[in-house]
Amino acid sequence: MWQSSLHWAVEIARRNLVVNERLLPQGRSLPAGAQLAVLEGDPTASSGDFTVRLKLPDGYRIPPHWHPNRENATVISGNFKVGMGDTFDESKMTTLGPGSFGYLDSSMHHYVMASGEAVVQVHGMSPLQVNYINPNDDPSKKR
């Protein structure tokens, strides 16, 4: 009996595992250059969990912005810099290396930068919405 239960659990786990995610060009709300893979859920939905993985080239920046929902991030590889506030200031950023975890509560103003190529996994509640402090920084308004 336990073998059939174990087999069922393994089959469920296989359906929920992502082995080699396909990276896609980033959405309209991020500056050009990043690649994004949706691992779980739908970050554009009006509710529900999502997990995405971002691959960022060296020097990639996301200007000061905020999200309406809490955001959790784990650095998979490379170095990911995070700063708080309304003005991008590299001297005030904290560097997170591989394996580092951080979270930002909703509406917290922040900015980020990759130091070397970085892969970051982000998990949160949908929708994943990026609200730029300076509307001129919003790439969706430039396309």
What are these regions (language model features)?
Residues 2-48, 135-143:
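A short, N-terminal "cap"/entry segment at the start of jelly-roll beta-barrel domains
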Residues 9-10, 71, 125, 133:
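Mature catalytic domains of secreted/periplasmic carbohydrate-active enzymes
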Residues 50-67, 96, 106:
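Conserved short histidine dyad/triad with adjacent acidic residue
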Residues 57-60, 66-87:
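Glycine- and acidic-residue-biased ligand/ion/polar-headgroup-sensing regions
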Residues 62-64, 82-83, 104, 109-115:
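Short beta-strand His + acidic residue motifs that chelate non-heme Fe in jelly-roll/DSBH
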Residues 86-107:
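Short acidic-glycine-tyrosine-enriched beta hairpin
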Residues 91-94, 113-143:
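Double-stranded beta-helix
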